[in-house]
Regions:
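Mixed-charge interfacial surface used for oligomerization/domain docking
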Residues: 2-7, 13-27, 32, 95-108, ...
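Short N-terminal secondary-structure initiator segments
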Residues: 57-72, 84, 135-153
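Glycine/charged-rich beta-loop-alpha catalytic/anionic-binding loops adjacent to active sites
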Residues: 57, 84-89, 113-124, 267
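Generic alpha-helical hydrophobic packing signal
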Residues: 7, 73, 77, 117-119
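N-terminal glycine-rich anion-binding loop in soluble enzyme alpha/beta folds
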Residues: 6-73
């Protein structure tokens, strides 16, 4: 590795397992989550499983608050004081949270806190949620630490982010009803009939791709949709995500191995930011599809 000091930073929506964050030296800053009049800092005040149980018991809708400008300024200043020369900061989709824009402003305000600082901030909008950007940040950190050029690793990461897709299934519509994403009537009828939506989440935009009846039909429908998005699933990198049900997780992993011909890169648990909208009962497949958008490569700040 070169003598240039590099640090890696992201937010808790990335859902990076703590063991991977520790392994690759990635700092993960928690989102603020409000539920039943109380504020919790994700990754510090509760575990994912505790949050899921709180959602089930609550009649209110959990809300999330963006990481603020002042929080980012304080964090950036600590990196400057530590002698960091390049800070790689990968953020939650800018279209779904003000966290990215707050970080942009913080990079400007940093000059007031640390006049004349020389740290380059590589601030990147992931255009997605959860481990799709968490995984690629881990890969970027791993390669940089192994001595690969930072600029090349950053370009590769952004290229892959333009290909990554999420296929999500919710086993209950209760949380979507609470959050207003579906009407109360539709949620009641849907749950009574056992309707399970298969949802794509690409570039921050969610879309119902299919509706199936019954839990047993969920994994096959997800796999079918994923197959429609790629040319060769045998060469497709993918991950499996879950909320609280290990049984549904294991069922999906088993089917993916059979249909895709290889095991997932990682099986991970979804955190509070995503599940605050989808509910505590869901599974997902994260995979590399075809390029969907041109990449506007980030320019270091300031």
């Amino acid at each position: 590795m070169s003598d240039v000091k590099v640090a890696f930073l992201t937010d808790s929506c990335s859902d990076i397992p703590q063991e991977l964050a520790d392994k690759y030296g990635i700092d993960v800053i928690g989102f603020h989550i409000m539920l039943d009049g109380k504020e919790y800092l994700e990754r510090k005040d509760m575990t994912n499983d505790q949050f899921y149980e709180m959602m089930r018991q609550s009649k209110s809708v959990p809300t999330t608050a963006a990481i603020t400008q002042l929080e980012w300024v304080d964090i950036y200043a600590k990196y400057v004081d530590a002698g960091i020369q390049n800070l790689v900061h990968l953020c939650i989709n800018a279209g779904g949270s003000s966290t990215y824009n707050n970080a942009v402003k913080a990079a400007e305000l940093l000059e007031d806190e640390r006049p004349g600082h020389k740290m380059k901030i590589h601030l990147i909008d992931s255009h997605t949620y959860s481990m799709p950007y968490g995984w690629y940040l881990c890969e970027c950190a791993r390669k940089v630490c192994a001595g690969e050029p930072l600029d090349a690793c950053l370009r590769e990461m952004q290229d892959k982010l333009a290909r990554v897709e999420i296929c999500l299934a919710a086993y209950s519509l209760k949380q979507m009803k609470k959050s207003g994403r579906v009407s109360a009537a539709a949620a009641v009828v849907g749950d009574l009939m056992g309707i399970r939506p298969i949802i794509s989440l690409n570039d921050g935009i969610s879309k119902v791709e299919a509706k199936v009846r019954g839990d047993n039909n969920v994994p096959p429908a997800m796999v079918k949709w994923v197959k429609s998005r790629v040319d060769d699933v045998k060469k497709m990198p993918y991950m499996v995500a879950y909320t609280s049900s290990t049984a549904k997780r294991d069922e999906l992993v088993k089917l993916c191995k059979k249909e895709f011909g290889h095991a997932p890169l990682l099986v991970f648990q979804l955190g509070g930011v995503v599940s605050a909208n989808t509910g505590p009962d869901g599974i997902a497949i994260v995979f590399e599809g075809k390029p969907r958008r041109l990449v506007d490569y980030a320019v270091p700040l300031p």
